[in-house]
Amino acid sequence: GNTAEPKGLDPHIVSGVLESNIIRALFEGLVGAHPSKDGVALPGVATKWYPVNQERPDEWVFELRKDAQWSDGAPLTADDFLFAFRRLLTPDLASDYSFMLYYIRDAEPYHKSQRSYLLSRKDANFTDEWWATLKEVDFGPNEEADEKTFNFKGLDFLTAEELKNLQAKPDLFTWPESVPAETRATLVAKNLAFAKSDKDLWNLIDFGATAPDKHTLKVKLNSPLPFLPEITKHYTWYPVPKHAVLKHGKIGDRFTEWTKPGNLVGNGPFIL
């Protein structure tokens, strides 16, 4: 049994063992754990799973139960998994376990808000020579820099107004000497245009998880991972009910009412 009250029941926010025990009773993931055999995955929401290429398992397919549903009777589809993945990676949610999804293509740069990288990587104007230097540069916050400088906040996190100031006075940001002046100006301009647009970085990424149809989930990884089904046993890979979460707040809101008794909608063997 549990020895104390849980601190919460949101699979994307809690991190304790006590909470995880309850969450596993309220929710079910793609696969389940065998009761007596380690390393053996049993069907969960997914009835079948397999790599597209057996010799290079960097892309997986999970076929979902067509009769899967939430405790309120709503259909549970691949879209609920996609919503759950995006929510876990949403920077504003500040989940402790977001890194569990870093295996998925483009999960890490989105979660870390690597704006400069995402804005520039597919730009034909960025030469291989530019990328040779840029890929080594971290445009995120620098806690060792003076708090009054743009370096402390990081280029990726500057507001439109701050980026305008940087365009006018390039010396407000200390660049690595390896980054040419032309590259610097281009990066600042791209960041400024995006900051003005008020768009979400999600629109820039080529996220590896997709849903070809309601009952199929495809996951493209950064590298081959033969034991991906085992990883999906962790509750951070569980689906969450999109309709219930958004009824009580936005995707990145913490500690909303959706996990309260009477509101929580799960897909596990128990209900709250």
Annotated model-derived regions:
Residues 1-55, 265, 270:
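N-terminal lobe/hinge region of extracytoplasmic solute-binding protein
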Residues 3-6, 14, 35-36, 54, ...:
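Solvent-exposed coil/turn segments that connect beta secondary-structure elements
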Residues 10-13, 74, 95-96, 229-234:
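Short, solvent-exposed loop/turn and secondary-structure capping segments
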Residues 12-14, 63-75, 205-207, 258-260, ...:
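Second-shell loop/turn segments in exported
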Residues 21-25, 40, 44, 76, ...:
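Extracytoplasmic/secreted proteins, especially bacterial periplasmic and envelope-associated proteins
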Residues 26, 45, 56-60, 64, ...:
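Envelope-exposed proteins and targeting segments
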Residues 34-36, 153, 160-207, 213-216, ...:
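Gly/Pro-rich hinge or "lid" segments in bacterial periplasmic/extracellular proteins
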Residues 48-180, 218:
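Aromatic- and charge-enriched surface segment that lines or borders ligand/interaction sites
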